Structures are given as structure tokens and as C-alpha cells.
Amino acid sequence: MIIVTGGFGMIGSNIINALNDIGRKDILVVDNLKNGEKFINLVDLNIADYCDKDDFIASIIAGDDFGEIDAIFHQGACSSTTEWNGKYLMQNNYEYSKELLHFCVDRQIPFLYASSAATYGGRADNFIEERKFEGPLNAYGYSKFLFDEYVRRLLPEANSAICGFKYFNVYGPREQHKGSMASVAFHLNNQMLKGENPKLFAGSEHFLRDFVYVEDVAKVNIWAWKNNISGIYNLGTGKAESFQTVAQAVIDFHGKGHIETIPFPDHLKSRYQTFTQADLTKLRAAGYQDNFKTVAEGTKAYMSWLNRSLTTE
């Protein structure tokens, strides 16, 4: 059996899709379905069972036997960078993760988990997986940073794989439940469907992000599990691209429209990252050599998926 926490979420459901593609359906999905809209992410996928997150944690703490487990992909967390309830974040992103980590280490189960590029804070270069380059700017980033530090202390003594991925700007299928936290490509597509032009903040041609397609993220997770990889790694494309490039890819797909600019909000000016770019040196050294989709390639694929009902009519 394979366990995927946060399995109804964007990255979790794409990992399940990738597992299905290699013939694995013996999957226990763990999640909090308080947001019932997330159910749609697994409708076309195959799983064996579902367990509520709170019940799962209680079972983990109690030391319950889940049978033979081949791996745990821990994607369940509060992923909102605007959440400032520190107690809630630490319970969900830190304490929960520690319980799962020790459960896996004690039983020598491969443990693959979601970290975040938010651990780097507002830096503009040297996105390197080392403590000296990290300095989160929000409570979410701190919760992820603290767990990375915990893992670093445990790694030398572990006899099974522990692998964390600092996700950069992930976009792609199965994110519609995320609301305001969904990718810019998702929001721009919605604007186009309303008959509007895609809108970007003034200066967006200078705002560069490492946008990584979610299917590539899932692919790296499966590779790491299959190859027994340990450590903490950046997971982006290694190339920053502009929001303008995203908008142009959306326009190209729809075959109409032009970019409109809107004023940059004052309240974001002091805490808005103008640049992110994963340093992939460590991931490449670990053996991952496949290419990542560019923004143009990934956005085109995503637009086809998002608008599939329109293109099949």
C-alpha cells in the first residue's frame, strides 16, 4: 500500500495520477475534506481507501498497524502564505509532519514530503538548499523551514529514505479548489472565459518566478521514491520566467486578447517576491536528468486540460 496525505489537493492528486500510470491503485488517501469541492480531483483516479486526517493522526500516534506500506507521500498541509494563525500552522505543518516522519523512520518506510521555496524568504538569488540561504518571511514559510531543519538533524541516523522537496511556483491541473491561492494561469484563463483581457500588475514583465508544471512535480516525486533518494531538494525548472510570459501563453491558446495592466497594490509592495529560481545543482547531482516544461509548454498543456470541455464540443 501507498499512503498519500493531502491526496485530494493539487499536488497530492497529481501524484496519485502518476501512481495510477505505473499501475498502483492500492492507495490510501488521507485528507481533510472540509472543502468538499476537492472531491472532483479524484473522480477520474483509482484509490483503495480514504481516511480523515484527524483519524489518521490518531491512528499514527496510537501505533496502529496499517499493513505493509511501500511509501508515504506527505503532501497534506496548510499551504496558504497568508495564514497567520501560528498555532494552527505549527500543528498542521510541523507537529503532524513530525509524527508521520517518526512513524516512517521507525518502520523504515520511505517518506517523501512537501517543503516550499517560501523557506527562502525574500532573497533574489542563491536559492540553494542550505540553512544559510533560508529566511522565511511568513508563518507558513517558517513552519516548512522548521520541519526541514528537523529533518536535517534526523537524516544522518535514518535507515530509510527521507526526501523533501522545496516546491517553487507549481501550476497545472486539479487546483480549481484553491480559490485565490490558485496559479496566475488559472485566474487569467477565467478572465478570458468571461470575455475579458488577462490582467497583470503594472511591472509584471519584471516579476520573474520559477513556474513548474505539476505533472513534472509528480514525476520527480515518483522518481525519488523509485530510486530511494534522501535529502532536501529544490523542485522547480531552474529557469525564472515572467508573469507576462504566462499571460501570453494563455492569449496564444485562446487566440485572442491582449494584456491589460492594473495598479500594483500598496499593501503588497514590501512583501512581494520579484524573483525566484530554483538552483537544481543538488537535484541533478542526485541523478534526475529529465527536462522540465517551459511556461509556454506547460501553460499550453494546462489550458488544454482546463478548457477540455470547450475543445471537445
Curated annotation (Swiss-Prot):
Catalytic reactions on record: ADP-D-glycero-beta-D-manno-heptose = ADP-L-glycero-beta-D-manno-heptose
Enzyme's top EC category: isomerase
Involved pathway(s): Nucleotide-sugar biosynthesis; ADP-L-glycero-beta-D-manno-heptose biosynthesis; ADP-L-glycero-beta-D-manno-heptose from D-glycero-beta-D-manno-heptose 7-phosphate: step 4/4; Bacterial outer membrane biogenesis; LOS core biosynthesis
Cofactor: NADP(+)
UniProt GO molecular function: ADP-glyceromanno-heptose 6-epimerase activity; NADP binding
Subunit (UniProt): Homopentamer.
Family: Belongs to the NAD(P)-dependent epimerase/dehydratase family. HldD subfamily.
Name of the protein this chain belongs to: ADP-L-glycero-D-manno-heptose-6-epimerase
Species in which this protein is naturally found: Haemophilus ducreyi (strain 35000HP / ATCC 700724)
